[in-house]
């Protein structure tokens, strides 16, 4: 538990120095359709990606911050779209959906590039975020 608190504090300090994120980077461009696939298969693929630290350059995965629901705020109990403090403070976005949250995390904590909007990876991670959200809300 102490390790998670230390990691959370380090992440907060890291994010505080990141400045801002252009909202256009985390908003689906007009005319670009999402990848369509079986939701169960996408969520299963998303779970593997959730644990993949190679998606970014920071050496962390989604699970690095959120193992066992760590670092989720109470607002995560609400279905998307909803306000996320990190996205609000760094991009002035009042509300974001799960797909946008994936893109935001790709850019900020994971220090990677946003995923292609029509990619299976983005659809899979967004599907798995839905699973994580439902599990967290049920606690």
Each predicted region: which residue ranges?
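Bacterial N-terminal signal peptides that target proteins for export
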Residues: 1-6
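C-terminal motif of bacterial Sec signal peptides marking the signal peptidase cleavage site
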Residues: 15-17
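Electron-transfer interface patches adjacent to heme c in soluble/periplasmic c-type cytochromes
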Residues: 21-39, 52-139
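Short Cys/His-rich Zn2+-coordinating modules
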Residues: 43-50
């Amino acid at each position: 538990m102490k390790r998670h608190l230390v990691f959370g504090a380090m992440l907060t300090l890291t994010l505080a120095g990141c400045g801002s994120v252009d909202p256009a980077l985390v908003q689906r461009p007009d005319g670009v359709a999402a990848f369509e696939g079986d939701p169960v298969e996408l969520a299963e693929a998303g779970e593997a990606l959730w644990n993949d630290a190679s998606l970014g350059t920071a050496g962390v995965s989604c699970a690095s911050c959120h193992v066992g629901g760590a670092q989720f705020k109470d607002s995560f109990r609400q279905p998307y779209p909803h306000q996320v403090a990190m996205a609000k403070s760094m991009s002035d976005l009042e509300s974001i959906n799960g797909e946008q949250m994936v893109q935001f995390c790709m850019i900020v904590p994971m220090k990677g590039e946003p995923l292609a909007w029509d990619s299976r990876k983005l659809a899979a991670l967004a599907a798995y975020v839905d699973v994580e959200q439902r599990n967290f809300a049920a606690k």
